[in-house]
Amino acid sequence: MSYLGVGLSPVNVAGTKMKLMDRKVRLTELILRCSVCALALVAAILIATDTQVKEIFTIQKKAKYTDMKALVFLVVVNGIAAAYSLLHMVRCVVGMMKGSVLFSKPLAWAIFSGDQAIAYLTVAGVAAAAQSAAFAKLGEPELQWMKICTIYGKFCNQVGEGIATALLASIGMVLISSISAFALFRLYGGNKAQQGSRW
């Protein structure tokens, strides 16, 4: 209670804590979306610009990312993830500037579904590229597949860097999808509390 005889009600304190928590969650989401956008873009550029030319028995062979379909898929997925994150960065910034909170269930479902889809795509892209990279690095003696990375060392190293960067972007998307799940399902939890207070 203050000296003026006016106290703080528990509802006001809880509301202030919720606003502070909501601000922190939105800031975390914005930072994660910026990180995912940058990491996905770097991963796509690292892999898409990677080439190496080797001469094998007087024949020049150029290794490029389009030679492995898993790398093409990874570049496309990272491009999509970067564009998607950029769009949602704008949404986050506008929401923070307006001070608005997401109360629309259909919009929350759309954001949650989009985040889930992009998270699954990035995880699938990293998994496929990692499997192809393992074959390139280790070969497959039973199928008489040779170790490509012994020939194209620079190419394999840059692809490895791209896959590692894509893995970080993928982890970021999984975290973002967790935040969007929190934002969605808290809309359902608050209604029960409000309905219970009416009785």
Swiss-Prot record:
Residues in the Extracellular compartment per record: 48-69, 128-164
Transmembrane segments: 27-47, 70-90, 107-127, 165-185
Ranges in the topological domain labelled Cytoplasmic: 1-26, 91-106, 186-199
Pfam families tied to this protein: CASP_dom (PF04535)
Any Gene Ontology CC annotation: plasma membrane
Entry superkingdom: Eukaryota
Subcellular location: Cell membrane
Swiss-Prot/TrEMBL keywords: Cell membrane, Membrane, Transmembrane, Transmembrane helix
Family assignment from sequence similarity: Belongs to the Casparian strip membrane proteins (CASP) family.
Subunit structure: Homodimer and heterodimers.
Protein name: CASP-like protein 2B1
Organism phylogeny: Eukaryota, Viridiplantae, Streptophyta, Embryophyta, Tracheophyta
